Amino acid sequence: ILDWNLKTWEKILNWGFWVSSTENLIVANVLRPGNTIIKSAAIEPHVMNLISFLRTAWADIKIRYNHEIIVTWVEKLSDNFEFDIVSDYIEAGTYMIIWALASKEYIDIANARIDDLYGIIEKLKEAWVKVEDLWNDKLRVFKATSLKGIQIQTNIFPWFPTDLQSPFAILQSQADWISKIHEVLFEWRLNFLVELEKMRANVALINPHEALIFGPNKLKGWVTVTSWDLRAWAAMIIAWLIAEWETKVTNVEYIYRGYEDFINKLKNLWADLEEVND
């Protein structure tokens, strides 16, 4: 929605807490004449990193603590500087879940920023996963010998991210007793649980936003599962890693949207998987 204030020529953009739209609005308005206020802006780590990048290039961007970002027009940006891109905290969180379930003892994850992972680490610890801070953006995640069923509710940063509820559901499937997922931000993002049922997971979809998982489940392979969602596809791979027998996961192209060299990284850590072209 565009709300033009003709007295100050200030353009106010009211938006949802979406990461991509926030990033696009910031970039689109840096060199656009006038001042822009982006309301309900996302503040995820990669949004903050984009702002830091643009500030290094002499952009005039201010952040308010009520999810407002103010972009003031500049005539030109610098193109002569160096900048470090932050690691993806969703990718780091995915690997934390994988190693809690599938590692032999523990694994160290480098370039994992603790502040970005707070909401994830707290839920892993609540589920009895041991996580150690080795400092200098390095984490040690231990294989879980037992897991506690817990409730997760997705939310905007810094709370538990919607992009990790699918992988976390696989961890919940191995926990004792009942776990609950409450997906606040999206409808029908829990549909991947229908695919998980093919692997003999005991789940119940309550409504488009809530589901129960009754554990622990001994997942079985010899089935074909699919996904039309990047994070659900990662969840299916995690389920395959801990399941008995071979599993086939289709729509592999989705994984490349959010994970760098995902298959080979798992193979380097002794996962027995192969990408095939049917």
Q: Where are each of the predicted segments found?
A:
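Structural preference for solvent-exposed beta-strand-turn elements
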Residues: I1-D278
